[in-house]
Amino acid sequence: MTSTQSVAVYATLILAIFCFNDIHCDPIAEARAAAFGEREARSAGEWKQFDVNGEKVEVNEQENREIIRQAGGDGVEGSVMVIDHAKGLIIWSIPRAGECYLIGGVDKQLPDAQELLHYFRSAQGSADGEGVQSALDYVKAEDRPVTDLNLLAPEVREACQGKSVYWLEKSSGDNNEPEKRRWCVYAYVRIRGVLVRYRRCW
């Protein structure tokens, strides 16, 4: 037995004693971390996954966060929206627009993680059938680029690498300028009967 293996075995025995009353403790994994400097990153809470309206929704009640992933097409990745209720922030990666966006504040129409989990569980598979009840429209604040990229959630950081990031603001509903543009990219995410929409035109 090598000296490294001896350290691992010894660490396993020691950690097994400390793990005796902790059902979530894995002495083997802890021993590997102690002997070889390995340690897995652990989320602060458990993620629940649902397939709704063609979107993959992940909900973490402890962190009060939601992730909505849309399927891509035509060689373009789908958009990813992270709703962080704890920080009051929405992070949105829209590959078709070639940019990423931040929304400061989470509209009260959007359910928090606990409400969304309760909704999915009580719907018993019928959530797909709920129609759109309201919509939240956003426009890009051209003069407000995001300078602190640490605000980007880890789930979209790679997708937003090297792209422009802007704040989105609620639309007043009277902006007809896109009608004069040549073409537009439309993006929306549906969350329990509420549409979050964005339109970028050139």
Swiss-Prot record:
Q: Which GO terms describe its biological process?
A: defense response to bacterium; defense response to fungus; killing of cells of another organism
Indicate the residues removed as propeptide on maturation: 26-181
Q: Look up the signal peptide feature and give its range.
A: 1-25
Gene3D superfamilies from the xrefs?
3.30.390.150
**SS bond list:** C100-C160, C184-C201
| Keyword annotations from UniProtKB, A to Z | Antibiotic, Antimicrobial, Cleavage on pair of basic residues, Disulfide bond, Fungicide, Signal
Q: What InterPro entries does its record include? A: BRICHOS_dom (IPR007084)
Domain BRICHOS: from-to ranges: 73-168
- Its biological purpose: Has antimicrobial activity against the Gram-negative bacteria E.coli and P.mirabilis, the Gram-positive bacterium L.monocytogenes and the yeast C.albicans.
Task: From the Swiss-Prot or TrEMBL record, give the protein name.
Answer: Arenicin-2
Q: Which species?
A: Arenicola marina
